[in-house]
C-alpha cells in the first residue's frame, strides 16, 4: 500500500474538534494522525498541529496532503511516546488520540488485520516487531490464553489458543478458520464474526495497544498547559474503561501534600471532566460510516 492509497473516514470529527477548541496560536498534538482528517479540521480552525503516527504509510499520506500548511508538521512515533516525540513543544493546548484502526489498515489485505480478505497474518501498525503469525508461533499456549482473555474478552480462549498453537496459521483466512473449528457452532455470536475477538486480541498484543494507552494516560498531566484539553476516542470496552477511570481519577484526585494527616482539598483534582458521559456518533454518522458505531469520545481539561 502506498501513501496515495491511504484514504480514511474520520470518526467523531466535529465533536472532537469542537471540544478541543482549536484557535489561532493554539498548539494541538494529533497523536494518531492516520488519514489526517482530524488534523485537517484543526488546521482549518487556525491551530498549529503536530501529527504523530507510527505507521509510515499513514504519516507519508497525511504529510503529503497537509504539509503545505506552515502550521502543520508530521512526526514519526507512537502516541505512548509523546513526552519524547513532542518534547520541544510541551506543554501544549490540546492532545487528541483516536484508538481505532484506520480503514486502509483494515481493508488492505497485505496489512493482515482483517479476516474479510486473505493476506499475511501481520497486524503490525508500524514496520517493526513480530507479526501476529510470529506471536502465535513464539508464545506458549498459556500466555496465548491470557492474551485472548485480557485483550479480546474471548470466552473460548482456551480451545482457540490450543488450536492456534496446533495449526500455527500464517494467513488471515487460515486463522479465522482455526477459530471456527475451535468454537462450537451453537456458541458463535450473532452480531459479530466468531473470529472478531481473537483478531482484536492478537492485534492489540502485536501492537502493545493497552500498554501504549496506559503510558498516554499517565503522561497527560505533563503534556498539557493549564486550560489544555485531552481527547481520546475509544472503540471497545477495554479501552473506554481505562480512559474513563483515568479521567475520573484526574478529576477527583486529592492534591494535598503527602504528609498531611487529613485531606484539605476536598478531593478536587487538577483536571475537570469536559464530557461527563462519553460522546457517541450520531445516527447520521453511523449510517454513513458503520465503523463509528462503537466510538466513544471522552475529554478532560487541565485546571491547574
From Swiss-Prot:
Localisation per UniProt entry: Cytoplasm
Function: Specifically methylates the N4 position of cytidine in position 1402 (C1402) of 16S rRNA.
Keywords of the record: Cytoplasm, Methyltransferase, rRNA processing, S-adenosyl-L-methionine, Transferase
Known EC number: 2.1.1.199
GO molecular function: rRNA (cytosine-N4-)-methyltransferase activity
Catalytic activity: cytidine(1402) in 16S rRNA + S-adenosyl-L-methionine = N(4)-methylcytidine(1402) in 16S rRNA + S-adenosyl-L-homocysteine + H(+)
Protein name per the record: Ribosomal RNA small subunit methyltransferase H
PANTHER family in UniProt: 12S RRNA N4-METHYLCYTIDINE METHYLTRANSFERASE, S-ADENOSYL-METHYLTRANSFERASE MRAW
Domain of life: Bacteria
GO CC annotation terms, alphabetical: cytoplasm
Gene name, Swiss-Prot/TrEMBL: rsmH
Binding residues for S-adenosyl-L-methionine: 36-38, 53, 79, 98, 105
Protein family: Belongs to the methyltransferase superfamily. RsmH family.
Biological processes annotated in GO: rRNA base methylation
Pfam families named in the record: Methyltransf_5
Classification via SUPFAM superfamilies: Putative methyltransferase TM0872, insert domain (SSF81799), S-adenosyl-L-methionine-dependent methyltransferases (SSF53335)
Amino acid at each position: 500500500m502506498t501513501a496515495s492509497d491511504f484514504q480514511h473516514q474520520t470518526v467523531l470529527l466535529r465533536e472532537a474538534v469542537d471540544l478541543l477548541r482549536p484557535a489561532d496560536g493554539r498548539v494541538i498534538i494529533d497523536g494518531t494522525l492516520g488519514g489526517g482528517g482530524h488534523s485537517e479540521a484543526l488546521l482549518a480552525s487556525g491551530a498549529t498541529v503536530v501529527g504523530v503516527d507510527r505507521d509510515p504509510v499513514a504519516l507519508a499520506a497525511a504529510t503529503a496532503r497537509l504539509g503545505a500548511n506552515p502550521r502543520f508538521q508530521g512526526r514519526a512515533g507512537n502516541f505512548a511516546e509523546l513526552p519524547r516525540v513532542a518534547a520541544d513543544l510541551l506543554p501544549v493546548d490540546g492532545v487528541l488520540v483516536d484508538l481505532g484502526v484506520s480503514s486502509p489498515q483494515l481493508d488492505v489485505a497485505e496489512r493482515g488485520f482483517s479476516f474479510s480478505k486473505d493476506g499475511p497474518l501481520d497486524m503490525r501498525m508500524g514496520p517493526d516487531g513480530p507479526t501476529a503469525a510470529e506471536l502465535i508461533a513464539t508464545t506458549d499456549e498459556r500466555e496465548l490464553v491470557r492474551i485472548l482473555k485480557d485483550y479480546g474478552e474471548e470466552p473460548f480462549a482456551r480451545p482457540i489458543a490450543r488450536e492456534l498453537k496446533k495449526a500455527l496459521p500464517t494467513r488471515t483466512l487460515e486463522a479465522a478458520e482455526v477459530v471456527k473449528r475451535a468454537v462450537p457452532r451453537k456458541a458463535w455470536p450473532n452480531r459479530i464474526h466468531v473470529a472478531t475477538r481473537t483478531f482484536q486480541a492478537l492485534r492489540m498484543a502485536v501492537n502493545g495497544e493497552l500498554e501504549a494507552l496506559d503510558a498516554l494516560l499517565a503522561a497527560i498531566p505533563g503534556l498539557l498547559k493549564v486550560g489544555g484539553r485531552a481527547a481520546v476516542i475509544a472503540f471497545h470496552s477495554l479501552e473506554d474503561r481505562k480512559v474513563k477511570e483515568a479521567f475520573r481519577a484526574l478529576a477527583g484526585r486529592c492534591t494535598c501534600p503527602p504528609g498531611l494527616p487529613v485531606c484539605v482539598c476536598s478531593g478536587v483534582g487538577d483536571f475537570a471532566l469536559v464530557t461527563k458521559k462519553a460522546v457517541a456518533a450520531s445516527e447520521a454518522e453511523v449510517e454513513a460510516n458503520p465503523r463509528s458505531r462503537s466510538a466513544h469520545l471522552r475529554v478532560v481539561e487541565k485546571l491547574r
